[in-house]
């Protein structure tokens, strides 16, 4: 999931660090819609990996998703390999996880993990644009630690509005 819409306060970027930008009112609304969609359309989330950026943390809070969270600086300005390493470190006891991160990385990760059985419409939409609050749903067979490129099935892409 990409973080929800953030605000650009007066004086940005000099006035406030990018890491500390908060959600815009639209982002608060979209994060809530995203959480509702996740609760309705995917199995219960058992683990969340979330960027330490304020907008990512606020996205998670306003989504209402309640699961153990690991906030990690590594997801802020991460490259796809770093995000995949973080996913591979998830405990095998976890069957459903949520990653709250940033663009352009989150779309690159979703597409890099996408393999056979993929929803081609969803993949095309992700490659065109991964808007704020966008959610890519992937099925991963096997253990997290064995996750490889092109090994997951992209089953849905949703943008709450």
UniProtKB/Swiss-Prot annotation:
<dbReference type="InterPro" id="IPR029033">
    <property type="entry name" value="His_PPase_superfam"/>
</dbReference>
<dbReference type="InterPro" id="IPR013078">
    <property type="entry name" value="His_Pase_superF_clade-1"/>
</dbReference>
<comment type="similarity">
    <text>Belongs to the SixA phosphatase family.</text>
</comment>
<protein>
    <recommendedName>
        <fullName>Uncharacterized protein ML1117</fullName>
        <ecNumber>3.1.3.-</ecNumber>
    </recommendedName>
</protein>
<keyword id="KW-0378">Hydrolase</keyword>
<dbReference type="GO" id="GO:0016787">
    <property type="term" value="F:hydrolase activity"/>
</dbReference>
């Amino acid at each position: 999931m990409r973080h929800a819409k953030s605000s650009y306060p007066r004086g940005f970027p000099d006035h406030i660090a990018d890491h500390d930008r908060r959600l815009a009112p639209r982002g608060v609304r979209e994060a809530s819609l995203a959480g509702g969609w996740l609760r309705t359309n995917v199995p219960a989330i058992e683990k969340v990996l979330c960027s330490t950026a304020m907008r990512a943390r606020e996205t998670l809070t306003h989504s209402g998703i309640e699961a153990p969270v690991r906030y990690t600086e590594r997801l802020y300005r991460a490259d796809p390999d770093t995000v995949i390493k973080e996913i591979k470190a998830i405990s095998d006891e976890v069957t459903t996880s949520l990653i709250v991160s940033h663009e352009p990385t989150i779309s690159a990760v979703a597409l890099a993990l996408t393999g056979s059985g993929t929803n081609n419409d969803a993949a095309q939409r992700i490659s065109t644009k991964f808007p704020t609050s966008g959610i890519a749903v992937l099925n991963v067979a096997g253990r997290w630690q064995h996750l490889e490129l092109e090994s997951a099935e992209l089953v849905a892409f949703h943008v709450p509005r």
